[in-house]
């Protein structure tokens, strides 16, 4: 149990570090949305930012981490909103540094005969707004005026599972 707690703490620290690195300002005049949150609204601008900083690249977790188990709750009605928020999807995404860190944690967990099941990773900003409309409590949903690690591709909702049985660990 100590090793599991250690791995989860390590994952949290790594993801928080990457989240901070991802959110550094590149000297570009930012745009704000209706909440005053700085956003990139033009895909061409985003592509330019990725060329300047590959850490902003979003990567497909199924390709980045072979064997990763996904149970994307917001593509089903099995979530706190009790409705499908995403179309049926078969993968999800994270920024490259977060995905690299997650891959390292999965490799360490394999030594303990465990792996990770992902419930959610990258989340479109529009979904954050829908969640906030239903639950205006930042203990349970991200305040759209701040955005979230999910919106930035730097957060995952997950649990640990046995890789053979796919049974979730009690946590």
Residue ranges of each PLM-predicted region?
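Short, well-ordered surface patches within globular domains
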Residues: 127
């Amino acid at each position: 149990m100590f090793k599991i707690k250690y791995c989860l703490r390590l994952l949290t620290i790594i993801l928080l570090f990457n989240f901070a690195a991802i959110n550094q300002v590149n000297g570009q005049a930012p745009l704000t949305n209706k909440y005053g949150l700085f956003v990139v609204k033009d895909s061409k601008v985003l592509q330019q930012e990725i060329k300047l900083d590959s850490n902003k690249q979003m990567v497909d977790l199924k390709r980045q981490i072979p064997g990763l188990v996904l149970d994307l709750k917001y593509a089903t009605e099995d979530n706190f909103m009790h409705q499908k928020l995403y179309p049926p999807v078969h993968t999800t995404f994270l920024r490259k540094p977060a995905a690299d860190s997650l891959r390292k944690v999965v490799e360490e967990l394999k030594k303990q005969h465990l792996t990770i099941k992902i419930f959610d990773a990258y989340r479109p900003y529009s979904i954050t707004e829908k969640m906030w409309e239903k639950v205006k409590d930042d203990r349970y949903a991200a305040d759209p005026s701040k955005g979230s690690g999910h919106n930035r591709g730097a957060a995952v909702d997950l649990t640990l599972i046995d890789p053979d049985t796919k049974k979730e660990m009690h946590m």
